[in-house]
Every structure is written in structure tokens, then in C-alpha cells.
């Protein structure tokens, strides 16, 4: 991979990460067209994607650092120091639990299907294209049928698990992590801005 190719892929990642259109899918499409993906060693491309996404993760931490710091400090204070009963905890502390619960499905499924995720199937252009179309249709359906009632403090344990399962679905090539989680959030009744914020 040349420096110019790396820059192009970085631009693709930056343009697609914060939209519900699968940055991984678009990176893989670009990698395929540029001849950078080996069918013999597809796991090398998976590793590259993991590394390139560290940059966008850092930008998310910078943008949401006040929110994340509030969640972290209140979670630690109310669960480790003061041991406050869950029902009496602050919204930020409860969000800490929701984030943990919402992360469990993708960790478990990711470990169980590690070989398939790193394999050739997730680099297949037909799989990626089909996934992009399917997600677009489902997201459009969610926008039309959603109730848009719930605020951030209304998110329940079940809601966070369902959103976590939606996130795990994004392990399929072409399905956007933010797209699936936002769609899941809309289907359970979250307001669109709340679904987007909780997704990131």
C-alpha cells in the first residue's frame, strides 16, 4: 500500500464514519477497486480497518469528552464509592450501565464468529452492496414508523441490549454500526437525536 492509497482510504473513512452508510463497507469497496485486498489473507484487511478506525474513535472521544467524563465519574462514584441503589442513580451513572450492557452482544458475537468476520465473505462486493441496500430500506422504514418519544433518561436495560444486538449485526460487511444502532433506537421509540447520540 502506497502513501497516496493510505491517504485516499483515510479520506473515505473520515467521510463515511459519521454517516449511517458503513465506513467499513466503503473502505472495503475502495480497497477492492484499488487491488489492496488479498483473498488468501483477508484478515490483513480486517486488521488494517481496525487500525484506521482508531483515528475516528479518537475524534469521537474528543467531541464527546464532557459527556463521557460525566458518565465515567458518576458511574464510578455511585457504584464503587457510594454504592447507590440502581433505581436512585443519576442518568449518567445509568448510562454507564447501558453502555456496558449494549457492548456485551457485539463482544460475544464477535468472538464467536471471529473467523467468519475476518474471512473472505465479509470482503465480498455482493454481500457489501446487498447489505448497504437492505440497511437503507430498514432505516427508511424505521424513520416512517418510529414513535420518537423516548429521551436519553428513558432508555431501559432491555433497550440497551436490543441496541447492542443491532450493533452486533453490523459485523456483517456493508452494515453500518451507527446505521444499525440508530435504526434499532428508532424502532424502540427513541427520538432521532437521542438514537444518534447514544449510538456514538
PLM region spans:
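Multi-pass membrane proteins that catalyze or facilitate reactions on polyprenyl-/lipid-phosphate substrates
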Residues: 1-200
Amino acid at each position: 500500500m502506497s502513501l497516496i492509497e493510505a491517504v485516499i482510504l483515510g479520506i473515505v473513512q473520515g467521510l463515511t464514519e459519521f454517516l449511517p452508510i458503513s465506513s467499513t463497507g466503503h473502505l472495503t469497496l475502495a480497497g477492492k477497486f484499488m487491488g489492496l485486498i488479498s483473498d488468501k489473507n483477508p484478515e490483513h484487511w480486517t486488521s488494517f480497518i481496525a487500525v484506521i478506525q482508531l483515528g475516528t474513535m479518537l475524534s469521537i472521544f474528543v467531541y464527546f469528552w464532557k459527556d463521557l467524563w460525566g458518565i465515567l465519574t458518576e458511574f464510578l462514584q455511585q457504584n464503587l464509592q457510594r454504592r447507590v441503589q440502581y433505581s436512585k442513580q443519576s442518568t449518567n451513572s445509568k448510562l454507564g450501565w447501558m453502555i456496558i450492557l449494549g457492548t456485551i452482544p457485539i463482544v460475544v458475537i464477535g468472538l464467536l464468529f471471529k473467523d467468519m468476520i475476518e474471512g473472505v465473505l465479509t470482503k465480498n462486493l455482493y454481500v457489501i452492496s446487498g447489505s448497504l441496500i437492505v440497511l437503507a430500506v430498514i432505516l427508511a422504514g424505521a424513520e416512517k414508523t418510529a414513535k420518537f418519544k423516548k429521551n436519553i433518561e428513558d432508555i431501559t436495560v432491555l433497550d440497551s441490549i436490543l441496541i447492542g444486538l443491532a450493533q452486533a449485526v453490523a459485523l456483517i460487511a456493508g452494515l453500518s454500526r451507527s446505521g444499525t444502532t440508530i435504526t434499532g433506537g428508532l424502532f424502540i421509540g427513541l427520538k432521532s437525536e437521542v438514537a444518534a447520540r447514544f449510538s456514538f
